[in-house]
Amino acid sequence: MKFLLPSIVIFLVLCQVFGEELGPKEDLDYWTGSNQVQDEWLQADPFREIIRRMTRKPRPHQFIGLMGKRSPANAQITRKRHKINSFVGLMGKRSQEEPESYEWGTVQIYDKRR
């Protein structure tokens, strides 16, 4: 058993060493003299390219807002009236002037503590 393990290791090492090609690999030339992609990148001015990309506006079909696409059936844009003293949030509609609102109650509590 002690003789078998070193002989297998030596056999695998010899297979690795003699399994390699000894000649130069001329067909696998990864570093060619002319790199077409790099030449195209160097021709354009990088600063102008960055500014052009920053100032480019999205096309109308590319821009989709937070609420998703609008349906083409309702093409009319209707303006909703905004009430000055009301707030519609995730908890529902609340008015700032109502004394039973949460904000009004906290203001009253702070005034009483002073």
Curated annotation (Swiss-Prot):
* Any single Pfam family the record assigns to this protein: Tachykinin
One GO biological-process annotation of the entry reads: neuropeptide signaling pathway
What subcellular compartments does it reside in?
Secreted
Propeptide intervals in chain numbering: 20-55
Q: Its biological function?
A: Tachykinins are active peptides which excite neurons, evoke behavioral responses, are potent vasodilators and secretagogues, and contract (directly or indirectly) many smooth muscles. Substance P produces a voltage-dependent inhibition of calcium current in retinal bipolar cells. It can enhance learning and memory, may regulate social approach and feeding behaviors, and can accelerate the functional recovery in postural balance in response to light after unilateral labyrinthectomy.
UniProt lists the family membership as follows: Belongs to the tachykinin family.
Q: What is known of its domains?
A: Neuropeptide gamma contains alpha-helical structures at the C-terminus which may be required for interaction with a cognate receptor.
What protein name does the entry list? Protachykinin
